Amino acid sequence: WSSDVCSSDLGVDYIEGGWPGANPTDSAFFDTPPRTRATFTAFGMTKRAGMSAENDDVLAAVLNANTPTVCLVGKTHDFHVDRALNISLAENTENIAVSFAHVVAQGREAICDAEHFFDGYASNPDYALEAIHAAHDAGARWIALCDTNGGTLPHDVHRITRAVIDSGIPGNRLGIHTHNDTENAVAASLAAV
């Protein structure tokens, strides 16, 4: 099979090729990307605390893959910002905004993978919305709402997605990224759209 045939037949618009710089296999994959009608996309994370977007070597590796589209994961759950990143919510919001502005300034289409969004919204809806608005306002074309733990029920996915749209992010700029830990991924995806 070829990725071009599969992406065309399935209607896939984007193919995420991995995280350049994360390991030799992912990095090598970007040296000779597949030829496809779908938009080839590099994945990475927002800039790290204490660094500028211009001087973060992890973000630079993603941009150096020279893909037309870059997808960055941004933490949207206050618990993970506090415990995993060990930074303030304000600093995380700034990191998100600066990272997406940097990607867009490089002439790339930007996708925000809003990590743990549904759990974050359940914990602190104002902050979860603040985080995705930071990406959107900085130029991210797409905001992918992530059910990273796969535990959000479909009716909650629908309600929260509606709240995101009501907060000012257009529905035609949203994506859904579900995990199937509780066998709800398909139903949750349908509820989101």
Task: Put a short name on every predicted segment.
Residues 1-7:
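Short, small-residue-biased leader/transition segments that mark boundaries at the very start
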Residues 9-12, 67, 107-108, 140:
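A structural motif
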Residues 12-37, 41-51, 72-87, 115-120, ...:
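Glycine-rich, proline-tolerant flexible connector loops at the mouths of alpha/beta enzymes
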Residues 23-48, 91-108, 112, 133, ...:
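Alpha-helix-loop-beta-strand connector modules within alpha/beta enzyme cores
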Residues 49-61, 85-98, 125-126:
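Glycine-rich anion/phosphate-binding loops
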Residues 52-62, 123, 127-131, 182-193:
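Catalytic cores of alpha/beta
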Residues 64, 69-111, 117-118:
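Hydrophobic alpha-helical hairpins/lids featuring a short glycine-rich hinge
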Residues 149-152, 161-193:
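Catalytic alpha/beta core domains of metabolic enzymes, predominantly
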